[in-house]
Amino acid sequence: MQRIMLRAKLHRVTVTEADLHYEGSCGIDEDLLDAAGMREFERIELYNVTNGERFDTYIIKAARGSGAISLNGAAARRAQVGDLLIICTYGPMSEEQSATHKPQVVLVDDANRVKEIRKFPA
């Protein structure tokens, strides 16, 4: 049996841009992608801490070191600049893998710079 498990999480990042007329997606600073082990075009689930919205889209790379978290297309209706988000990726794992798996959690500062990387639960 396969279980769908939390793989990685960007915790409480701040939305820096929302562009309704872009094709779609979520732009994420490459430093954050590397820290979380996330990849461009990977499906993500987003949880808006500010307004309670939950939605999904896919990742595109934003400039390294920019602190950018940009919501594009329809996703731009789900959050405003300044909102706090939790961004998660999930993946299938065997029973054996899931028994010992620890998701990667990236905590950020107010400028969306990596503050701490840890395995969850701490």
From Swiss-Prot:
Reactions performed catalytically: L-aspartate + H(+) = beta-alanine + CO2
UniProt-listed Enzyme Commission number(s): 4.1.1.11
Enzyme class, UniProt record, top EC level: lyase
| Residues where Pyruvic acid (Ser) is found | S25
Function field: Catalyzes the pyruvoyl-dependent decarboxylation of aspartate to produce beta-alanine.
How does this polypeptide assemble, per the annotation?
A: Heterooctamer of four alpha and four beta subunits.
Name of the protein: Aspartate 1-decarboxylase
The record lists the lineage as: Bacteria, Pseudomonadati, Pseudomonadota, Betaproteobacteria, Burkholderiales
What is this protein's gene name?
panD
